[in-house]
UniProtKB/Swiss-Prot annotation:
The lineage of its organism: Viruses, Duplodnaviria, Heunggongvirae, Peploviricota, Herviviricetes. It comes from the Viruses. This is Putative membrane protein ORF6. It comes from Ictalurid herpesvirus 1 (strain Auburn) (IcHV-1). GO terms for cellular component: membrane. The chain crosses the membrane at residues 4-20, 37-53.
Length: 138
């Protein structure tokens, strides 16, 4: 017998008579029609539970992907507007863009990912124990 049959025997939901440990049979039994309904309800509940988990997971992936696409679209639109207007300031507004930005041409197409990386200013990193002014000698 499988575990589902054992559960039904113990719960009294099948038409089988449960045999007790002392060998006597129990007088309690339920018709087979009732057990069929119970089985269908249990299978339906199990399938519903199993289907909600992947649906919730897929919805979460969709929401995260959608947010990432919208964020990237906003960043590309800012870069595109900067190219059109000739604005060469970074997001902080006071740092001029590096020499790589002057190589870009103004076009009606949004810049590629590589061009967008060229537009970001690279700030010098201070090495431990060395003053920043000593590193930037020109």
């Amino acid at each position: 017998m499988n575990s589902l049959t054992i559960i039904f025997l113990l719960s009294g939901l099948t038409a089988y008579h449960a045999v007790l440990a002392d060998g006597t049979g129990s007088s309690e039994s339920v018709t087979a029609g009732d057990s069929g309904v119970v089985v269908l309800v249990m299978i339906g509940a199990l399938l519903t539970l199993l289907m909600t988990i992947p649906i919730i997971g897929l919805f979460g992936i969709y929401v995260r992907t959608r947010a990432s696409i919208e964020e990237m679209r906003g960043i590309l639109m800012q870069i595109h507007l900067r190219l059109i207007t000739g604005d060469q300031r970074s997001n902080r507004g006071d740092v001029e863009l590096g020499a790589g930005a002057s190589l870009l041409t103004i076009s009606s197409q949004p810049p590629s990912y590589a061009e967008a990386l060229l537009m970001e200013p690279v700030e010098p990193q201070q090495q431990e124990g060395v003053p920043l002014e000593a590193e930037i000698r020109v």
